[in-house]
Amino acid sequence: MVAALHAGKAVTIAPQSMTLTTQQAADLLGVSRPTVVRLIKSGELAAERIGNRHRLVLDDVLAYREARRQRQYDALAESAMDIDADEDPEVICEQLREARRVVAARRRTERRRA
């Protein structure tokens, strides 16, 4: 946190037991409010319904954010490849195309499950 402050980045401090509205959760996750509602409906994010409003526990939102970040890092690591400077550019382009195909196919199957 101190490093972020020194770098001039914004830092948010909030108690860990705080509950959030869907808009606050969306702001924290960097997504739209409808996306948060969709995540709640799909069961990816836990929420309590109070009247016609959803309330999310800050710990749950932070845990989801960390899990999402880890999935992104894993996807990057999985799609990374070593490129030799002596390798033919056409071979490299074909390897990149194949990596994109694999990632796109994985996304399609994940969307079908959801």
From Swiss-Prot:
Name of a matching Pfam family: HTH_17
Signal peptide region: none
GO molecular function, a single term: DNA binding
InterPro entries: DNA-bd_dom_put_sf, HTH_17, SinI_DNA-bd
NCBIfam families named among the record's database cross-references: excise
Name of protein: Uncharacterized protein Mb2337
Organism whose genome encodes this protein: Mycobacterium bovis (strain ATCC BAA-935 / AF2122/97)
